[in-house]
Structure formats: structure tokens, C-alpha cells
């Protein structure tokens, strides 16, 4: 156990629907350190309710702010109407990095909007870096993100397994894609990251399936994690039993829409998580899921929606 008491409490806030209208890129060769004032020793992970998609905001020590993916297949203008307003509500005026796990629309549609708004001067929010998986072939959506970043004067970084990015005391290790990844199967070659902050460990798995989970188990000595962003919105073909037996997540968050037609999350995946003794939070039932971390404990806040 990394914490004597990892999840201090699960707080439920009821909302009725009718009321809701060093960047040290390790690369084993070079590194740049992003320096800044340490306002307070904390980490805040917000898994936003973007419908059938992913959008996660990380706030690190009151100084660094990151977006991991940002898109939806069933909500239009999710960047304009959900992600940007959320950032403003948190007083965030700068994103130090936007991490894109892969280029499916349900992970990038909102990010495209944000970059377009930045490029046109339609938002006061600034973006420093766009971090993409290092693929040998760059699909159309990948090239579009590059172009939007260039117009917005946002630096593009490409990362692969073995790279490390540090923000203050938070360390992001890139576990996937492996060197030489082509980019043909964007799900299985998606960016996978492990976040370490003090004793806390979180795993962000994009849309990988069991095939890549097995490769990760072979390539790394994966250990227990406190937080797991469940891959592919809870698909039956991800989050396998063998993988869960290794990473043993204390908390798992599934981002999906209540009206999705894919059967997400699958009963099989939910059963595997339950058998692993994992606390499950689902954005289709809870809305946004907020995880607050300090050096000793992890607090979770979720919203029960009628």
C-alpha cells in the first residue's frame, strides 16, 4: 500500500440535469527543466464529463496546468463550451502542455477548437506545448493538429517510450508508443503515461487494448497504481484481468456517455475491475470526477446526476 489510507472519502454531490443548461523530456539524451514557483504541494486531476470522449485537466502545485486529450464524439464544441469554461472557472490562464494520446476525434475535437481559438486570439488562455505520440507516419488528424499548433505559436513535441517530462515534483513517464511505432493502429499505438507525484501513481492509458497491455507488462515492471484512467471508455477489449492483477488500481475512472451506442462500459470490464477490488467512478453517472492528492492521501469527489 502506497498510502495508509489512499481514498479518504468519496464525496457525492447531487445535481439535477434540468438545472444544468523541468520540461525534462528525458529522451535518454536531453532535457529542459520547466522552473516555476511552488505555490502549494498538491495535485488535482479533473476527469471532465465530455460525453463519449476524454478530457482530463491536471493542476500541479498551483503552478503547472496540463490537458490530457480533449474531445467528444457526441457533444459538439466541447472545447468551447466545456473545456475552456472549466479552465477559466479554475483561474487557469495557461496550459503548459496538451498531451494527445492518439488522434481519434473523441480525444482531439475539443483540443482542435482550443488551438484554433488560441491561434485566432479568441481566448486569453495560452498554450505552451502540444505533446504528440512519436509515430513514423502522421495521419490527417495528426497533421491538422500540427498546423493548428503552428498557427497558434505552440511548440510541438513528439514523445515515445522511455521519455520523461517533469513539472515541479510531478514526473510523467511515457511508457508507450514504442520506438518505431508507425501510427497505423492509433488505439494500440496510443500514448500511455505514468504520473508519479510523491507516493501517488496514476496511469493514463488512452484507448489501448489488451494486446498493448500485455506488451507493457513485458516491457516494464509495472507496479500498483492509485489511479487508472480506464482505456477505451471501458471497452470489453481493454483492461484485462492479467493487467489489473499487476497494476491493482485503487481508483478507476471511466469516461463515457450515458447514451453511447458502443455498450461502454462493458459489463465484463466492470466485473474485472470489481473483482480487483477497485473503486469505480463513471462520468456517465457521476459527471466530472475530481481527484485531489497530497503527500499522504487521495480524495475523490464525484457528482451523482439525476
Predicted stretch roles:
Residues 1-306:
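Non-globular, low-confidence helical/coil segments that flank catalytic cores
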Amino acid at each position: 500500500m502506497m498510502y495508509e489510507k489512499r481514498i479518504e472519502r468519496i464525496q457525492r454531490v447531487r445535481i439535477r440535469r434540468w438545472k444544468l443548461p523541468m520540461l525534462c523530456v528525458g529522451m535518454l539524451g536531453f532535457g529542459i527543466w520547466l522552473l516555476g514557483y511552488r505555490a502549494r504541494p498538491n495535485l488535482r486531476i479533473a476527469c471532465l464529463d465530455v460525453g463519449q470522449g476524454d478530457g482530463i485537466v491536471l493542476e500541479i502545485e498551483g503552478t503547472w496546468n496540463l490537458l490530457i486529450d480533449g474531445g467528444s464524439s457526441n457533444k459538439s464544441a466541447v472545447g468551447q463550451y466545456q473545456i475552456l469554461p472549466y479552465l477559466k472557472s479554475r483561474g487557469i490562464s495557461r496550459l503548459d502542455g496538451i498531451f494527445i494520446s492518439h488522434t481519434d476525434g473523441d480525444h482531439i475535437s475539443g483540443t482542435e477548437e482550443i488551438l484554433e481559438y488560441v491561434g485566432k486570439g479568441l481566448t486569453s488562455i495560452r498554450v505552451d506545448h502540444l505533446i504528440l505520440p512519436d509515430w513514423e507516419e502522421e495521419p490527417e488528424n495528426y497533421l491538422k493538429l500540427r498546423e493548428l499548433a503552428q498557427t497558434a505559436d505552440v511548440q510541438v513535441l513528439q514523445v515515445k517510450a522511455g521519455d520523461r517530462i517533469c513539472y515541479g515534483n510531478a514526473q510523467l513517464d511515457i511508457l508507450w508508443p514504442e520506438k518505431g511505432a508507425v501510427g497505423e493502429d492509433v488505439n494500440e499505438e496510443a500514448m500511455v503515461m505514468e504520473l508519479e507525484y510523491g507516493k501517488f501513481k496514476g496511469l493514463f492509458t488512452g484507448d489501448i487494448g489488451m494486446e498493448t497491455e500485455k506488451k507493457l507488462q513485458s516491457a516494464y515492471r509495472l507496479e500498483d497504481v492509485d489511479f487508472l484512467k480506464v482505456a477505451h471508455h471501458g471497452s470489453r477489449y481493454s483492461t484485462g484481468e492479467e493487467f489489473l492483477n499487476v497494476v491493482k488500481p485503487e481508483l478507476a475512472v471511466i469516461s463515457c456517455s450515458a447514451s453511447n451506442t458502443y455498450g461502454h462500459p462493458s459489463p465484463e470490464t466492470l466485473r474485472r475491475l470489481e473483482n480487483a477490488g477497485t473503486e469505480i467512478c463513471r462520468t456517465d453517472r457521476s459527471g466530472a470526477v475530481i481527484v485531489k492528492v497530497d503527500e499522504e492521501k487521495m480524495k475523490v469527489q464525484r457528482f451523482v446526476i439525476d
